[in-house]
């Protein structure tokens, strides 16, 4: 199934450049866009993934059809980084997770512009283009922290920037890519050392969280009690294991803590 799934993701990524942006709509929330490419890719993925695992269901960003159950469920973001796509920023990805018993057992992120395939299966490690990857061991004061601004939720903008500034004062620097999936993938392979965003949907973090965990990293919902859940919007905090406590301490100081 792995090879077939990777081919499905690559075909979906071809839509990014092979199709023209003929329609851009505004969804609910500030700067929340959907294009004809988002819809075309999701339609393709739904058909391909349901054929790959008969009896499964698909939860996608554009349709949000179905709810997460114990049954095999694909959680899909057809274009993570739609605003980047609109501006030809070339930092967008296809994100696919397969959940069983409400937990990801497989995660894939395909960045077509860089031809990079991030992949993980629960208990079997993570890879980039077939080579095993691990999170970094960079110390806290030299860490690079990626973040998202939760742009669809303007009420979180000030808190997001305040938190980013706090990390900037504590670590080496901060980065903003515009794609949570890519940020999590880059964390998994050591390109940066931590990531936060104050509001993400399951299709933003389901695949990436598994890839980070299988690469030896830590992923939490710092404002939620208990373990990671994949059926809700939530703040996401992720990092390498060696700086997890320090990253969490800054987050708690500036953005709150578990309920």
Give residue spans per PLM region:
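Residue-level signal for inorganic ion chemistry
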Residues: 16, 38, 49, 82, ...
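Acidic, metal-binding active-site segment of PIN/NYN-like and related structure-specific nucleases
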Residues: 57-63, 216-231
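Acidic beta-strand-loop-alpha-helix segment within the catalytic core
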Residues: 97-184, 226, 232-259
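Acidic, metal-associated active-site segment
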Residues: 183-189, 206-214
């Amino acid at each position: 199934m792995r090879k077939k799934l990777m081919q499905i993701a690559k075909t979906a990524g071809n839509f990014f450049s092979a199709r023209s942006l003929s329609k851009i709509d505004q969804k609910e929330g500030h700067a929340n866009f959907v294009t004809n490419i988002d819809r075309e890719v999701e339609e393709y993925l739904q058909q391909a993934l349901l054929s790959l695992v008969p009896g499964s269901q698909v939860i996608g960003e554009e349709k949000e059809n179905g709810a997460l159950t114990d049954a095999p469920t694909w959680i899909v973001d057809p274009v993570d980084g739609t605003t980047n796509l609109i501006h030809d920023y070339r930092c967008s990805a296809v994100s696919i997770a397969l959940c069983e018993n409400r937990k990801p057992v497989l995660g894939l992120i395909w960045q077509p512009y860089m031809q990079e395939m991030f992949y993980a299966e629960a208990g079997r490690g993570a890879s980039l283009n077939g080579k095993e990857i691990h999170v970094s061991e960079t110390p806290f004061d030299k860490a690079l922290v990626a973040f998202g601004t939760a742009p669809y939720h303007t009420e979180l903008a000030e808190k997001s920037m305040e938190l980013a500034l706090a990390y900037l004062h504590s670590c080496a620097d901060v980065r903003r890519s515009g794609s949570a999936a890519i940020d999590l993938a880059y964390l998994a392979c050591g390109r940066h050392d931590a990531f936060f965003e104050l509001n993400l949907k399951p299709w933003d973090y389901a695949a990436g969280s598994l890839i980070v965990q299988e690469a030896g990293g830590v992923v939490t919902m710092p404002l939620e009690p208990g373990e990671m859940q994949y059926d809700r919007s939530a703040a996401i905090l992720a990092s390498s294991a060696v700086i997890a406590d320090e990253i969490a301490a800054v987050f708690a100081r500036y953005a709150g803590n578990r309920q």
